[in-house]
Structures are given as structure tokens and as C-alpha cells.
Curated annotation (Swiss-Prot):
Protein name: 5-amino-6-(D-ribitylamino)uracil--L-tyrosine 4-hydroxyphenyl transferase
CDD domains the record matches: Radical_SAM
Gene3D superfamilies for this protein: Aldolase class I
Cofactor: [4Fe-4S] cluster
Catalytic activity line of the entry: 5-amino-6-(D-ribitylamino)uracil + L-tyrosine + S-adenosyl-L-methionine = 5-amino-5-(4-hydroxybenzyl)-6-(D-ribitylimino)-5,6-dihydrouracil + 2-iminoacetate + 5'-deoxyadenosine + L-methionine + H(+)
Gene: cofH
Length: 367
């Protein structure tokens, strides 16, 4: 394959060890055959690290309120309490949705919501206990670092105290959302009222320290550049070296159509397909030996492009989901619910082995 000498040298090295930040930034700029070579190299590392299984989980998202005091410029989900289409689900209704989800096969509930005024750690604790008392076997993968931080502030608790309360109540793991781009200059534009980079890292490292594993995410394609993406992934890499608490990395392409910062002319219209493939491939090469699982979210990418991402370093396709109002509000057009049979079909179509998993990737069963 006719590729640049530097590209070839980096990719050959990547077969044996993680690439550096400088090498990752260089690879963010490759095109043509060099991009194809990057994708192939990442797929080879994926095979060495994670094998030929493509995993998925039967889960259900419950976004319990869209009322939020935050001011995130990428979010089209947020409403004020006075808005006609605002909503807040009472615990009884959440339990009804949980029962329906579990009846349909969900083994994980991912519960997140807006920063409803006054909600605190004790609210989240009571909600966890209510669900676990009714459904003791379901795994609760719930509450973003921002919700944890906000709830702790409102309860006048430290982050560590709050997390210990939630763990005792039955919280199994946390989504590593609210990361967006871990650069405070970028955050000042896209999410000025959200926790800072340092505060996000504090919540995540504390969660890992008290025994709550998390995922990690990166939302890109708005006002960020390649250097922000590489630095973000390097921050995640350093956390994982320290704690080992990340279960997977989930790239989240910016959904621009209804996002305020796009409508105001401040943001790009999302990442390109080449951008997406570079993120999947480079993350695989950066996280070598540290984060085994990289998710290609079909809700964000659609099944067709998710297949390409799965040939470029990713090894997980996400969940069946049930409902996912946040992406839908922002303009995602690929649906919010799928059946396992559809996931199995698209995985087999690329010559891989579909496998059903649990949240923490501890129980994996070929299907």
C-alpha cells in the first residue's frame, strides 16, 4: 500500500504499543490511502485486543425529566419548568417504565435527567432504592458526573460522600457523560454552567476509587479541533492508567440540527465521516492495553456507518435502548429502539460474531 513513510512508521509501532499524543495528532490529519491504512491498523489492534466478537446489551434509557437549570449550547432536550412540553416523571411512573423494559428483556436501566431545581443526592438514593426493591437483579447504570456533582452540592455533601450513598443504595455503574470535550476554553462556549474539566475528572476518579465503574465519552464535531480530541483522549488514558475504572469508550458525534450553538452560527455542522473514523481508529491505538471496549453508537451513526466504525477499531455497537430522548431532540435520525435481531444481522454481515453482554463486560454470550 502506497502510504507516507511517517504514517507507515507510526502504524507499525502501533502494532506493539500505544501511540503518543504527537503521533495521534499527526494521524488526525491523514487522508486517502493513509486513512485507509489507519483504519486497517486499528482493526488489527481491535482483533488482538478484543477478538472478533461484536457485543451489545439489552438495555433501556429513562430520561426522567427535561427540566434543567443548565445552559449547554449543544442540548436541544432541555426545557424550563414553564414550557408546555416540559415533563418530570414521578417515581411511580419510572417504576412502570422499568417494569415494561425488564419484561422486554432489559438487563440494564440507564437513568439520566436534566438538572431539575433542588434535586439532590437523597432523591437519587431514594429512586435507586425504589427500583432495586422492585427489581433487585436489574443493573442500574445511571446518573452522569454532572448529576452526581449537582446532587452533592444541593445535599451539602462531598462528591465522595454522595457516591458512597448511591453505591450503598444499589448504583452499579455510571455513564461517563458530561465530558463533552475536556478543555475549559471549549467548555466555556458549549457548556458554561457545567462542571469544569478538573471537576469532571474528580467525580470520575472518586467513583472509581469507591468502587463504581464508569464508561467514558467524548462529544466532538462542534467548536473543537483535532488537538482538543487528542488531548481529551489523553486525559482519559491517564485516568485509566491511574484507576482502571473505565469499562468502555463511547465517541459521541455532535448532533447539530437542533442544537442552539449551531443555530446561532457558533458550531460546525457536526463531524464528517472521515472525522468519525479517525476518532474510532485513533482511540483504539491510543487506548491499547488500557480500554479494551470501544462503542460505535448506532443511534448516533446509523447501522450502516456503525458497520464501518466496527471495521475501524470499534468492538461494541451499544444497546437496544428503548428510548433515548436526548439524541432524538438534538436531531439524531436513526431511531431510539431496535431489536437484538437487527443488531445480530448487521454484525454478521461484516463477518463478526454477535455477542450479548452485561454492563461491565463480565458476562458475554455468543448469539
Amino acid at each position: 500500500m502506497n502510504i507516507k513513510t511517517r504514517t507507515k512508521k507510526i502504524l507499525q509501532k502501533a502494532m506493539d504499543e500505544p501511540i503518543t499524543k504527537e503521533e495521534a495528532l499527526y494521524l488526525m490529519g491523514v487522508t486517502g490511502r493513509d486513512l485507509q491504512a489507519l483504519m486497517i491498523a486499528a482493526d488489527m489492534v481491535r482483533e488482538a485486543e478484543a477478538g472478533d466478537r461484536i457485543t451489545y446489551i439489552e438495555n433501556w434509557n429513562i430520561n426522567f425529566t427535561n427540566i434543567c437549570s443548565g445552559q449547554c449550547g449543544f442540548c436541544a432536550f432541555k426545557r424550563d419548568a414553564a414550557d408546555g412540553d416540559s415533563y418530570y416523571l414521578e417515581t411511580e411512573r419510572i417504576l412502570e417504565i422499568a417494569a415494561e423494559a425488564i419484561e422486554k428483556g432489559a438487563r440494564e436501566l440507564c437513568i439520566q435527567g436534566g438538572l431539575y431545581p433542588g434535586l439532590d443526592t437523597y432523591f437519587y438514593e431514594d429512586l435507586i432504592r425504589a427500583i432495586k426493591s422492585e427489581f433487585p437483579d436489574v443493573h442500574l447504570h445511571s446518573f452522569s458526573p454532572m448529576e452526581v456533582y449537582y446532587g452533592a452540592q444541593n445535599a451539602e455533601l462531598t462528591v465522595e460522600e454522595a457516591l458512597k450513598i448511591l453505591k450503598r443504595a444499589g448504583l452499579g455503574s455510571m455513564p461517563g457523560t458530561a465530558a463533552e470535550i475536556l478543555d475549559d476554553d471549549v467548555r466555556a462556549v458549549i457548556c458554561p454552567t457545567k462542571l469544569s474539566t478538573g471537576e469532571w475528572v474528580e467525580v470520575i476518579e472518586t467513583a472509581h476509587r469507591v468502587g463504581i465503574p464508569t464508561t467514558c465519552t467524548m462529544m466532538y464535531g462542534h467548536i473543537d479541533g483535532p488537538e482538543h480530541r487528542v488531548e481529551h483522549m489523553d486525559i482519559l488514558r491517564r485516568i485509566q492508567e491511574k484507576t482502571g475504572g473505565f469499562t468502555e469508550f463511547v465517541p459521541l458525534p455532535f448532533m447539530h440540527p437542533h442544537a442552539p450553538i449551531y443555530r446561532e452560527g457558533l458550531a460546525m455542522p457536526g463531524a464528517t465521516g472521515a472525522d468519525d473514523l479517525k476518532v474510532y481508529a485513533i482511540s483504539r491505538l491510543m487506548f491499547r492495553g488500557l480500554i479494551e471496549n470501544i462503542q460505535a453508537s448506532w443511534v448516533k451513526l446509523g447501522f450502516k456507518f456503525a458497520q464501518v466504525a466496527l471495521l475501524s477499531g470499534a468492538n461494541d455497537i451499544g444497546g437496544t435502548l428503548g428510548e433515548e430522548n436526548i439524541s432524538k431532540s438534538a436531531g439524531a435520525s436513526h431511531g431510539v429502539r431496535t431489536e437484538p435481531e437487527e443488531i445480530i444481522r448487521v454484525v454478521r454481515d461484516i463477518g463478526r460474531i454477535p455477542a450479548r453482554r452485561d454492563t461491565l463486560y463480565r458476562e458475554i454470550e455468543d448469539v
